[in-house]
Curated annotation (Swiss-Prot):
Family, per entry: Belongs to the ammonia transporter channel (TC 1.A.11.2) family.
Name recorded for this polypeptide: Ammonium transporter 2 member 2
The organism of origin for this protein: Oryza sativa subsp. japonica
Disulphide-bonded residues: none
Protein origin, superkingdom: Eukaryota
Residues spanning the membrane: 35-55, 64-84, 140-160, 174-194, 203-223, 238-258, 274-294, 298-318, 322-342, 356-376, 412-432
CC terms in the record's Gene Ontology section: plasma membrane
InterPro entries cross-referenced by the UniProt entry: Ammonium/urea_transptr (IPR029020), Ammonium_transpt (IPR001905), Ammonium_transpt_CS (IPR018047), NH4_transpt_AmtB-like_dom (IPR024041), RhesusRHD (IPR002229)
Chief site of localization: membrane
Topological relation to the membrane, as annotated: Multi-pass membrane protein
UniProt gene name: AMT2-2
Task of the protein: Involved in ammonium transport.
GO biological process terms held by the UniProt record: ammonium transmembrane transport
Subcellular location(s) of the protein: Membrane
């Protein structure tokens, strides 16, 4: 009788000894972080690309969408070359980490870690260990890239309709390296604001305040659009703009839900609070439009949605849901006031041509959210996510100290972005014009790219403003009449509601 030796058991899909599944890796955490990264990516691609291509005048649809597309792609390359480790690597300075690539498998397949995030008490004892999520470094690199990319895409909203695309191509990598990485390390990567106790749960300061301030600063240096464009900048497709806004709203589930670096209770609270704040802010903004202007504005509703999402971001996982509703009410009213009332009364604000009012929807809403988080953050939720023991808002016993920290963090981010953005643009301006020429601005996409979003004219013919046969007005009473260049270009714009700033 021959006995057959049993073959050794084959590793199953959930066994811990698979080469690709080390003991520290949690498959659920990995799956959620990749999904969250994808959600945030969808906010930029196609969310903001669609919004930018539809909310602007028809002649700027291609250029506006491409500015977002280019920013997204260029950010990824710079991020893996040096940017990620400048924002989340080993400490170099109190506000900056050491540069280095995130390209080798030796680095990317190891357990993710934030090396500078350990927090020590005043006596030198370790109070909070460094953050080490249960997935590979590659997942963290991807997730944090999406945050960096959307910051630059948001910044572009201040510059639509006149910035030289070559200057924009030079600006994006420089701003990422010298501005974004500083804010990210200071507040998230273990820098001095992180260690001091400034709360920025998911980017109210790192992303929204920085993009709003930098966008406004860049708009000042680049200069305004043509007078005719500033006076009439009608969206070319409001329905498409709403679709892009919907992608932005739903994608925020990954934005705030992925911030704890795990699918835990903090993430669930954050996602619920995010939606509540967005809805409340949208309704508040719409009601104010009806009260003061007699009718609801669809563009205003999208702006209100945006400010609600931005305002809740600094504290999404740290406040009660009733607090999220309160924050939504402030988000729908304070930026509305600064945009619709204060802006029009300020000579300086009127001088700076912030195309999509990014300063109001992101900088103002971001600071507002940071301040309200300093008031409303609960000790129970802070204990689950914050690095310093006993963190809480003013209304829960922190005293005025936490509010002071929130204001101090906002001041640092504002001043840094003001100085660095100005320096970058002044340097670029020595070699590349920041603004397109007036002749190019009259034409738009065709001058900038040789392409048009809506290129068919008449019976399948591409419209060409330089060819008389395609610009003559026919029909009864109009045969043989030629419009002036200004009239033809004006007629190309869509009719509809516009953002009047």
């Amino acid at each position: 009788m021959h006995l057959r030796m049993a073959s050794p058991p084959q590793p199953g899909p959930y066994m811990p000894d698979l080469p690709a599944v080390p003991a520290w890796l949690n498959k659920g955490d990995t799956a959620w972080q990749l999904v969250a990264a994808t959600f945030v990516g969808i906010q930029s691609m196609p969310g903001l690309v669609v919004i930018y291509g539809s909310i602007v005048k028809k002649k700027w649809a291609v250029n506006s969408a491409f500015m977002a597309l280019y920013a997204y792609a260029s950010t990824l390359i710079v991020w893996v070359l040096v940017g990620f480790r400048m924002a989340f690597g080993d400490r170099l300075l109190p506000f900056w980490a050491k540069a280095g690539p995130a390209l080798t498998q030796d680095f990317l397949v190891q357990r993710a870690v934030f090396p500078a995030t350990a927090h020590y008490g005043s006596d030198g004892t370790l109070e909070t260990p460094r953050t080490e999520p249960f997935y590979a470094e590659a997942a963290l690199v991807l997730f944090e890239f999406e945050f960096a990319a959307i910051t630059l895409v948001l910044l572009a909203g201040s510059l639509l309709g006149r910035m030289n695309i070559k200057a924009w191509m030079a600006f994006t990598p420089l701003w990422l390296l010298f501005s974004y990485t500083v804010g990210a390390f200071s507040l998230w990567g273990g820098g001095f604001l992180y260690q001091w106790g400034v709360i920025d749960y998911s980017g109210g300061y790192v992303i929204h305040l920085s993009s709003g301030v930098a966008g406004f600063t860049a708009a000042y240096w680049v200069g305004p659009r043509l007078k005719s464009d500033r006076e009439r900048f009608s969206p070319n497709n409001i329905l498409l703009m709403i679709a892009g806004g919907g992608l932005l709203w739903l994608g925020w589930a990954g934005f705030n839900g992925g911030a704890p670096y795990a699918p835990n209770v903090t993430a669930t609270v954050a996602v619920l609070n995010t939606n509540v704040s967005a809805a409340t802010s949208l309704l508040t903004w719409t009601c104010l439009d009806v009260i003061f202007f007699g009718k609801p504005s669809v563009i205003g509703a999208v702006q209100g949605m945006m400010t609600g999402l931005v305002c809740i971001t600094p504290g999404a996982g740290l406040v009660h849901t009733w607090s999220a509703m309160l924050m939504g009410m402030f988000a729908g009213s304070v930026p509305w006031f600064t945009m619709m009332i204060l802006h029009k009364k300020s000579t300086f604000l009127m001088k700076v041509d912030d195309t999509l009012a990014v300063f109001h929807t992101h900088a103002v809403a971001g600071i507002l959210g940071g301040v309200l988080t300093g008031l409303l953050a609960t000790p129970e939720l802070c204990a689950l996510d914050c690095p310093i023991p006993n963190m809480r808002g003013v209304f829960y016993g922190s005293g005025i100290g936490q509010l002071g920290k929130q204001l101090g963090g906002a001041l640092f981010v504002t001043v840094w972005n003001l100085i660095v953005t100005s320096a970058i643009l002044l340097c670029i301006g020595l070699f590349i014009p920041l603004r397109m020429s007036d002749d190019q601005l009259m034409i738009g996409d065709d001058a900038a790219h040789g392409e048009e979003a809506y290129a068919l004219w008449g019976d399948g013919e591409k419209f060409d403003v330089t060819r008389p046969e395609t610009t003559r007005t026919g029909g009864a009473g109009g045969a043989g009449r030629e419009d002036t260049m200004e009239q033809r270009l004006t007629n190309m714009g869509a009719r509809g509601v516009t953002i009047q700033l």
